[in-house]
Amino acid sequence: MSKHTRVTSSETAINQHRSLNVEGFKVVSARLRSAEYETFSYQARLLGLSDSMAIRVAVRRIGGFLEIDAHTREKMEAILQSIGILSSNVSMLLSAYAEDPRSDLEAVRDERIAFGEAFAALDGLLRSILSVSRRRIDGCSLLKGAL
């Protein structure tokens, strides 16, 4: 192909199709009105997604697949970091108490309470993330709401 030869969009699509591993995937097509497509595509681009990825995210959400947003991920990481710190604190306090039973037992109790609260927060967050039936209901509600 010379450098002045123009590649058509269908050739580009064929070349992309050849380079992708499509094994295990099903191709789904949908007819959209021009305004629907333009709005959808614009929204996908704002999020940095291709049209295909945006459709896949929507399908996964409706199907109840696990998707964790950045805020939830940050919250989980903060809780896990807190649990790690609290665990170290409790361990150090218990070691100090074992060496000298006159050490501050109240500090051990306070750290233990905070540790339990952090675990409860993590448990609640994980339950909301992992609740398959709730995710499917949420996704189906989105779909029904769109109809």
Swiss-Prot record:
GO terms for molecular function: endonuclease activity. The keyword Nuclease applies. The keyword Membrane does not apply. Tumor formation by A.tumefaciens involves the transfer and integration of a defined segment (T-DNA) of Ti plasmid DNA into the plant nuclear genome. The virD operon encodes a site-specific endonuclease that cleaves at a unique site within both 24 bp direct repeats flanking the T-DNA. Keywords: Crown gall tumor, Endonuclease, Hydrolase, Nuclease, Plasmid. This is T-DNA border endonuclease VirD1. The gene is virD1. Pfam families: VirD1 (PF07328). InterPro entries: VirD1 (IPR009933). Its EC number is 3.1.-.-.
